């Protein structure tokens, strides 16, 4: 089971409550920076550019940036698939994401969407390539608790996360992606996958991923897995394998600590995707709101 977190703050905070709300999925974000009219030049350019993204992203290793038009009618777009996606899977994911994005944001000049399998699509009327954008973001965590010694767990987890973040940040201009796993005692392993849009610099990729790791730690320390998604980066770790390993993108790790406890219960089996499990009702969503004046 998973919980999705979003933070909303109100002024004059006197007391705090956490309020649970109904199940939701991961939805596209429509920016309020401007609209275009039906059959306008900008609208036609947007449709043409988005239509080209699934084919070009899948043929280009899972990442593409593109532009079309001139002046105020120019459209900028980016699409990226998770680093272990096949070309066929990438095409399908980007195509589905675009259709959902266009249905939800039919006339917005800027919109952004991701799926649970981390297919990212972003378009705008201005250049955003290479720019670090931390919001909008979403955090999702597994409600199961870590049953190992937390001090030992934290040491192993931090070493693993540092390794995959360094590996991904040092990637190329076509792929900034890394996976890794680490032994937790003799009976468990921790798995992690991180990725940035490769238009980011090494420093900006590192910053995006480390802020995502910090967000997970601040909200969900001690849980059995988690995901943080941002416009420029994806951070996920679990206590079960959930990606296709590849030697060229696997981070090198230090030897793990010696086991100090008997085998704990196995973690939950991997879901098909974060998004699909939300839609099936297997994820619980909660919005953390700071409410004033409650006695």
What annotation goes with each model-predicted range?
Residues 2-295:
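Extracellular secretory-pathway ectodomains and N-terminal mature segments of eukaryotic proteins
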């Amino acid at each position: 089971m998973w919980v999705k977190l979003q933070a909303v703050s109100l002024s004059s905070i006197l007391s705090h409550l956490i309020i649970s709300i109904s199940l939701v999925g991961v939805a596209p974000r429509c920016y309020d920076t401007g609209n275009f009219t039906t059959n306008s030049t900008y609208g036609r350019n947007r449709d043409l550019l988005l239509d080209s993204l699934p084919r070009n992203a899948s043929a280009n290793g899972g990442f593409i940036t593109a532009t079309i038009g001139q002046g105020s009618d120019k459209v900028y777009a980016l699409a990226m698939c998770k680093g272990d996606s096949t070309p066929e899977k990438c095409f399908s994911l980007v195509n589905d994401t675009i259709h959902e994005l266009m249905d939800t944001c039919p006339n917005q000049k800027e919109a952004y969407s991701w799926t649970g399998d981390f297919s990212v699509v972003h378009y705008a009327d201005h250049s955003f390539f290479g720019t670090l954008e931390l919001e909008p973001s979403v955090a999702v965590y597994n409600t199961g608790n870590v049953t190992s010694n937390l001090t030992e767990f934290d040491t192993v987890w931090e070493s693993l996360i540092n390794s995959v973040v360094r590996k991904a940040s040092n990637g190329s201009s076509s792929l900034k992606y890394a996976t890794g796993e680490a032994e937790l005692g003799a009976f468990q392993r921790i798995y992690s996958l991180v990725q940035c849009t490769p238009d980011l610099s090494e420093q900006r990729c590192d910053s995006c991923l480390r802020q995502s790791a910090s967000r997970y730690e601040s909200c969900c320390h001690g849980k059995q897995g988690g995901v943080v998604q941002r416009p420029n980066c994806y951070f996920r770790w679990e206590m079960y394998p959930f990606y296709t390993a590849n030697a060229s993108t696997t981070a090198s790790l230090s030897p793990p600590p010696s086991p100090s406890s008997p085998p704990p219960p196995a973690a939950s089996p991997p879901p098909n995707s974060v998004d699909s499990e939300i839609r099936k009702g297997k994820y619980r969503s909660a919005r953390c709101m700071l409410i004033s004046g409650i006695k």
